[in-house]
């Protein structure tokens, strides 16, 4: 299928561009959930690369006593169910308020910041490398972040 081949070529190209930036001295590359999220919020991300095989969830927990909120990433719903996290303000156990996949969370933030999003399959060597070596979350930056 020609369209599928074009998608695969585009995916390989964008992952290779990320890897090229990664090895440069002041390269425009960022990876890992926390670092990419920070760069995304700053508006520094040009292209966000996300593995289609990301299964983590982004949850918002709220304190029933003081109303304080915390965002937490969990690997699975069962991990979230077991979470007994105390509120950093008053010590009360936080309750789950809302939930979405990590992919949905990142795509929303990318759209807010006018960053391009590339969902990368694990059908290619580059796609597997993105998932295994970089946790499935990477970015090509608009400018160098010091």
Language-model regions, residue ranges each:
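Terminal alpha-helical anchor/extension segments at protein ends
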Residues: 1-146
